[in-house]
Structures are given as structure tokens and as C-alpha cells.
Amino acid sequence: MTRQILVGGVPIGGGAPVVIQSMLNTKTTDVEGSLRQIRALAAAGCQVARLAVPNREAARGFAEICKESPLPLVADKHIPIRIGVNGGSLDKRLLEKYGHPTAEALVESAFEHLELLEKQGFYDTCVSMKSSTVPTMVAAARLFRSKCDYPLHIGVTETGPVKQGLIKSAMGIGALLLDGIGDTIRVSLTDDPVQEVYAAKDILKAAGLRKEGVNIVSCPTCGRTRIDLIGLVNRVDEALRDCKKPITVAVMGCVVNGPGEAREADIGIAGGDGWGMLFEHGQQVEKLPYEELLPALLRRIEAM
């Protein structure tokens, strides 16, 4: 088990639940804009927000933001200290030693920074070692964890377009979480930071580390499908994105196999040719016209 630190009132490490982070893409000098984004992140489920503080003007903005932020904030200079090692900014000496940003180079850089802090008697530190290459990031985190117990912030950086970023992040973060490695995570996307939070929540749910929120299961469609299943699944996902009930909802493409295949779901819908059924634990509850399926599902979930 890792040692524990506190960021504001949020515990990181020491057996605490994995914490979701995101980073603002506003200018820290834009106090009101930054606060709006922080509030949106908090509403989505973010627990810690990071801001860039590159100069004194930004530091003044950061101070104002701290006064009203509903979330603990992390900046370049903040307590507790976060050591962030990135493959794109390694010391030239380490690049010459290892040839390129290897996992070993990232870990050695992290330990060099930790040693500087430990010599000053400071141990309240969280460490991050990120790479845009999934195997390198995973190997670095595993190597670091085998050597010490500082809490780890994990994530893949510079992940590319959103679809690629989601896959890379799910692979890298998910592999480590299933190994029991990782105390706080960020899914880095070239997108609205709120989408990073939703993705992080989905990864934690898929890894079995977070029960809060809806788990949607749906079939991949086949020749029996007689409804717009893709559109229906997307509408269900959008409608239930902020639902905090720990339930599994099935959206199936046919009434022949759908309810049986999704019998483990708490509730679900299956479509036929112009009609469909609402079911719970594989048993039919109601037969409905297709256009009434989604409203009926949402009403039933609301009443659960």
C-alpha cells in the first residue's frame, strides 16, 4: 500500500479510492472563466483540478480562484508537491544515458527529484511519470511501484485525437489499475476537460473500482436488429450520463435474444419492428411502441 497525502481534503494513496483529476484549459488570469470550468468539472465528478501558473500574473489569478473554487487545486508550485516527469522534458543527461525516454529514464528522473525533497525533510509528495507511449508509461509506473511507496498519479499524455486518446488511456490506465497501481488518474484528451472526467469515471467503473453511476451494456447489432440501436444507445448514454444510481442498464437490438442475453442487467429495453419491450432482470415488464421505449425506461429508472 502507498503512503497517503492530502490535496485539500481529498486523500490520495494509502488505500483511498482512486481520485479523478483534470486540467483546466482556460487562462489562469481569467478568474471567472476558470471558476466556471472548475464548477463544470466538479459537477461531472472531478475531485482535483490542475491549473497552469507560468508567471506572477497567473499566480495572482490562481490566488483569486482558490478563494471560490469548490475543488482542491494543483498548480506548478503547490503543497503537497507533485513531481511530474514527462518523456518530452527529460534532462539531456538522462536522454544521452538511455538513448530515448525509456521507462528506466523516467523512473531515474523521478527518484532524483524525490531525493532533493527528502534531503529537505519533505515526504508529502505525489509522483507522476507520463509518456505518450502506452507501454513506456505502464512499464515506468510498474518499475517505480516496485521500488517505493509514494502515491502515483497515472495517465497517458499527448494521446492524439479523441478516439485514439480514449483507447490509449483505457489501455494504459486500465492495465495499471487492474494491477493495483495508481492513486489518482487523468485521462488527457484534446477535448473539453469535462469529457476527461466522464472518461475517467468510465475507466474506474470498468476496472471495478467505482460503483457510482450507470453501467450501460448493449449488443453490437446483427441482422435481427430492426431499430436504430446505435442512435438509441447514444440517447440513453446522454440521458443517464449524470445519473449516480449504481445500476446496469441494457439496450438490446432485438426481443428474441436481447432480454435473455442481458438478464444480469437491472433494467433494459429491447427493440422489435416498430415496437419493443421494457424488462427487468431478463423478465418482460411492458410492451411498448418504439418511440415510447426511452421515456418509459427513464421513468422507471427515476422511480428505482
What are these regions (language model features)?
Residues 1-23, 32, 238:
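N-terminal amphipathic alpha-helix/helix-capping segment at the start of soluble metabolic enzymes
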Residues 15-33, 52-54, 73-75, 94-107, ...:
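Active-site mouth loops of central-metabolism enzymes
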Residues 20, 76, 83, 127, ...:
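Conserved, mostly hydrophobic/aromatic
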Residues 25, 30, 42-71, 125-134:
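Glycine-rich, proline-tolerant flexible connector loops at the mouths of alpha/beta enzymes
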Residues 56-78, 143-152, 236-238:
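Alpha-helix-loop-beta-strand connector modules within alpha/beta enzyme cores
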Residues 85-89, 94-244:
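Catalytic alpha/beta core domains of metabolic enzymes, predominantly
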Residues 232-263:
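Hydrophobic alpha-helical bundle architecture
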Residues 263-264, 270-274, 283, 288-304:
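Terminal leader/tail segments of proteins
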